[in-house]
A protein has these predicted regions:
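N-terminal membrane topogenesis motif
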Residues: 1-43, 60-61, 230-239, 456-483
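Small-residue-rich midsections of specific transmembrane alpha-helices
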Residues: 63-89, 247, 251, 280-305
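Alpha-helical transmembrane segments of multi-pass membrane proteins
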Residues: 67-72, 109-113, 121-153, 343-350, ...
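Short runs within selected transmembrane alpha-helices of multi-pass transporters and secretion channels
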Residues: 78-82, 139-160, 195-209, 350, ...
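Specific pore-lining/lateral-gate transmembrane helices of multi-pass inner-membrane transport
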Residues: 94-104, 277-357
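Alpha-helical transmembrane segments of multi-pass membrane transporters
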Residues: 153, 168-190, 350, 402-423
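Hydrophobic alpha-helical transmembrane segments
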Residues: 169-216, 424-447
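Transmembrane helical elements of multi-pass membrane transporters/channels
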Residues: 199-299
Length: 483
């Protein structure tokens, strides 16, 4: 994220209201804009193509397909991306740029294999048991694979510091998707639901191809050293578990409520809970600005303190190390408190706006009853995300693992318990899980503050560890003495 910080520093140098608004807008573009582009495209398609006139069963099939494509493409990419990101960071630090393409190829293979391993049996069930048209099933599978490739290639574009291009490629892909949908329905007279799914698949593939071309344009040399990449999965297995548990925790409460009386089943294949899922979506959007605020604040303030501490460790005096460490942790505490304060104000304003405005547009009943508790849960969850990033800064993978494990398990158990209660408390599982993860991560950061010196100076090795044949015990012979 260093590239974002450099760009933001240039923007904020002017110290004007317009500069601050520009910086906030830039942070939004590189973080949440792609998601809003996709959502906006689907909504625009629905309005222009007359989606509301489609039968209830067909709409349910489209909603279930699109929901599963997004959720499981994220879950598929989760185990690999954190480790691959760590590998690329080390490669760039060591200036071994020719090792980036092997990393890309290995990650691409692993993502496609895992996605296919999960997707093909599901699609076979959808066709054979759900009796869904084979062409529709195949198109949905292609859209799923395309989105996996999109999410995967985004990791490498961030290394190229082409954050704007990620949003631009999403915008291009979704513009083509909208044009294709209009062409298929208005000109060719094709069925609305399938035309929307096919158009989105085309848009995702176009986005993936543009990202792939950019990666290949930046990194042309290939060292063909693939074993190094695989070795990182053994060395940093905790990153695999952390990223997967955090991503699973985002959706595990939804999975629980998909098996309650809120359940909607389509074609004996897709199971989801529209009421709970919609409340979840509203709660996430209520707190989404915290991601933008966090990136802006960390890149502008904490990263500078962290860099100063790192430089002091490398070649500074003990007094310099101690002072920079104290300043760094004071800045960390300040950033967390600022994030909580700013996000609380924004979330409260958005919550009140939703409560007042949304009922006028049909959002009422159980959705608005479930929404408040989930909004609180996502508020704590995004603060937990910030703490996990700080733990990554200090290379405390054990702390991050404990936090995400507690978050995921308590969210699941709490959701199972709250599912039997009132609608108002359906989100208590997420609240309890997020608070558990937040508490573990908070105390782990405090532990790191107290034991930072041991963590930095006592965690390494004085001698290089090698695996080879043991040398002979004879170290001196009479012949050597005569020489």
């Amino acid at each position: 994220m260093a590239g974002i910080g450099i760009k933001l520093q240039k923007i904020y140098e002017k110290k004007t209201i317009l500069a601050y608004l520009t910086g906030f807008g830039y942070s939004a573009v590189v973080t949440v804009a792609p998601m809003f582009v996709v959502i906006g495209t689907v909504m625009l398609m629905s309005q222009l193509l007359g989606y509301e006139n489609v039968g209830y069963a067909r709409r349910g099939l489209f909603s279930g397909t699109l929901l599963y494509i997004f959720i499981f493409s994220l879950l598929t990419a989760a185990p690999f991306n954190a480790v691959l990101s760590r590998y690329m960071s080390d490669v760039i630090y060591e200036e071994r740029y020719e090792d980036i393409l092997p990393c890309y190829d290995v990650g691409l293979l692993l993502n496609i294999l895992l996605a296919s391993l999960l997707g093909i049996p599901f699609c076979a069930w959808e066709h054979l048991v759900g009796h869904v048209n084979l062409i529709f099933v195949f198109t949905g599978f292609c859209g799923y694979i395309a989105l996996v490739l999109v999410f995967y290639s985004m990791l490498y574009l961030s290394i190229c510091k082409d954050y704007q291009k990620i949003s631009l490629y999403f915008l291009t892909g979704m513009a083509v998707a909208l044009a294709c949908a209009l062409f298929f329905v208005k000109v060719c007279g094709r069925e609305i639901v399938y035309s929307m799914l096919l158009s989105l698949t085309i848009g995702f593939f176009l986005t993936a191809v543009l990202e792939y071309a950019t990666v290949k344009r930046y990194f042309k040399r290939n060292s063909n050293r693939y074993r190094r990449v695989f070795s990182y999965f053994g060395r940093y297995w905790k990153l695999v578990v952390i990223n997967f548990l955090y991503t699973l925790g985002l959706y595990i409460h939804n999975f629980v409520f998909w098996n309650t009386d809120l359940q909607m089943r389509v074609a004996d294949t897709f199971v989801f809970a529209p009421t709970y899922d919609l409340a979840t979506c509203l709660a996430m959007f209520t707190n989404l600005s915290s991601t933008i605020i966090f990136i802006t604040r960390v890149e502008m303030h904490f990263h500078t303190r962290y860099k100063a501490y790192s430089e002091a460790v490398i070649g500074g005096r003990w007094e310099d190390i101690k002072n920079t460490k104290d300043r760094m942790f004071r800045q960390l505490s300040a950033e967390l408190m600022n994030l909580v304060r700013m996000q609380f104000i924004i979330s409260t304003a958005v919550y009140l706006l939703c409560v007042v405005v949304l009922p006028q547009y049909g959002f009422s009943g159980r959705v608005m009853q479930i929404y408040p508790c989930l909004a609180v849960g996502y508020f704590i969850l995004f603060i937990l995300y910030a703490e996990i990033i700080f733990l990554y800064y200090f290379n405390d993978l054990t702390g991050a693992l404990l936090a995400t494990l507690g978050f995921c398990l308590v969210t699941w158990a709490g959701s199972v318990l709250s599912a039997g209660g009132s609608d108002l408390w359906y989100g208590m599982g997420l609240v309890a899980g997020s608070f558990t993860g937040f508490t573990i991560a908070y105390f782990r950061l405090r532990f790191m503050e107290r034991h930072m010196d041991e963590h930095i100076f006592c965690g390494g090795q004085l001698f290089t560890v090698k695996r080879e044949r043991m040398p002979e015990s004879m170290v001196y012979t009479k012949k050597q003495k005569e020489r």
